């Protein structure tokens, strides 16, 4: 083994879907890591991006995504990839290849860009880009521990069915959506509900909508 030899890593996503029995909405992705030589461990940082330009959109979906990309006439300028999240993953010792799980915690907060994007899609797939950085630990020819950084030019693609997102959210919020309010707005809404002896938040919103036509 050359003194400066270091593992050459390759990454691919083999599967993706809903993480069963998670306490909060979570997607999971099966990540295959391959190496040209034995590895002690990998401290991996996985960056996820939504490659929004890599799928078609119906007119209904364009309307649902207007807050992200503007009206149909603006899409040529505004349609772009969206940063989703970063996930740290610890990979244990392996030779040749190993399969690890990348859990991605999700939210139904529509103020979050990725959530708005998923919520605006009716069907099809979400094109995802995975970028990989971090540090690989390995032994040299004399058995001494060596450390090398992982270049961010390592990438993998995966297409996640929109149905996986909807299944996950329906499992955690059955028949419901989620709305975030500033505290002042919530206090006013709560006072309106109490003042009008309304029993649920649905009744409160309906009363306000009916009042304003």
Task: Tell what function each PLM region has.
Residues 1-28:
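Low-complexity, acidic Ser/Thr/Pro/Gly-rich terminal tails and inter-domain linkers that flank the onset
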Residues 30, 45-51, 100-153:
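Internal, hydrophobic beta-strand segments that form the core of beta-sheet-rich folds
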Residues 63-73, 137-178:
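Short beta-strand elements
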Residues 183-200:
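Surface-exposed, Lys/Arg-rich phosphate-binding patches that contact polyanionic backbones
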């Amino acid at each position: 083994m050359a003194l400066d030899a270091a593992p050459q890593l390759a990454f691919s996503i083999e599967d993706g879907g809903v993480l069963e029995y998670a306490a909060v909405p979570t997607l999971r992705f099966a990540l295959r890591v391959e190496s040209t030589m034995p590895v002690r461990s990998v401290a991996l940082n996985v960056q996820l991006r939504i490659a929004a330009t890599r799928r078609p959109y119906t007119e209904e979906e364009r309307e649902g995504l207007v807050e992200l990309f503007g009206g149909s006439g603006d899409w040529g300028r505004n349609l772009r990839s969206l940063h989703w999240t970063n996930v740290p993953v610890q990979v244990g010792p392996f030779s040749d290849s190993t399969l690890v799980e990348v859990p991605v915690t999700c939210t139904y907060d529509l103020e979050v860009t990725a959530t708005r994007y998923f919520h605006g899609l009716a069907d099809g797939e979400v094109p995802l880009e995975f970028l990989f950085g971090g540090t690989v630990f390995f032994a040299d020819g004399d058995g001494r521990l060596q450390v090398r950084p992982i270049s961010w030019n390592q990438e993998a693609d995966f297409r996640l069915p929109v149905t996986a997102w909807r299944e996950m959210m329906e499992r955690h919020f059955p028949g419901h959506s989620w709305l975030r309010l500033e505290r002042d707005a919530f206090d006013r809404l709560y006072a309106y509900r109490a003042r009008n002896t309304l029993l649920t938040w649905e009744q409160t919103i309906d009363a306000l909508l009916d009042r304003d036509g």
